[in-house]
């Protein structure tokens, strides 16, 4: 099995894609999907199976990856506290302004944990936005690829700005490698691999 990307422990995926080889006698992919779902753990569900070219690679052929990080100011419950991050208050206007600083090509040397390729730390963020959906606030990032824990460190910095512990100017300095100011990633439970685009 070849996955489109790896995630940190406790990070979720609603749009993970993988490719594999199945025997030729499997022509009914709906039946195969049902059989697999009956035997997989309840935390994993296959949504769709489709035939692709023999040279398709779910990781290397991906053009864009979309991640979302969910926060709420509402009290969490035992049923949802593993799937969303609770914070006390949200300055929506400030976060909408701050998140735009990530758009573009940057060297994310100061936005990754060990385990990433230390030599190849440049990444392009195509889009970054912050918005509210019902009782949930969403950080939404679209990029070609990411370094290990990059998004959690980005969100961690944004939440520190929200709490007035950091500033947008501090964020600019770290993005431009002038200072390594902030090193604390947001907790994993609010992060989702949402979509892979080919």
Predicted features along the sequence, with ranges:
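Structured-RNA-binding interfaces characteristic of tRNA pseudouridine synthases
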Residues: 1-198
């Amino acid at each position: 099995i070849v996955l489109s990307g790896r995630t940190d422990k406790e990070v979720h995926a609603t749009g993970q894609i993988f490719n594999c080889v199945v025997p030729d006698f499997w022509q009914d992919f709906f039946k195969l999907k049902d059989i697999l779902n009956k035997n997989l753990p309840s935390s994993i569900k296959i949504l769709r199976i489709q035939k692709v070219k023999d040279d398709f690679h779910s990781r290397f052929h991906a053009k864009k990856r979309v991640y979302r990080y969910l926060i709420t100011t509402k009290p969490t419950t035992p049923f949802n506290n593993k799937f969303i991050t609770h914070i006390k208050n949200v300055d929506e206007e400030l976060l909408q302004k701050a998140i735009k600083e990530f758009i573009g090509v940057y060297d994310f040397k100061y936005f990754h944990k060990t385990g990433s390729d230390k030599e190849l730390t440049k990444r392009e963020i195509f889009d970054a936005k912050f918005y509210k959906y019902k009782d949930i606030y969403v950080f939404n990032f679209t990029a070609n690829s990411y370094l290990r824990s990059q998004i959690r460190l980005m969100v961690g910095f944004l939440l520190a700005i929200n709490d007035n512990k950091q500033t947008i100017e501090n964020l600019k300095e770290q993005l431009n490698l002038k200072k390594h100011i902030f090193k604390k990633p947001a907790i994993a439970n609010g992060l989702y691999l949402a979509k892979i685009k080919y």
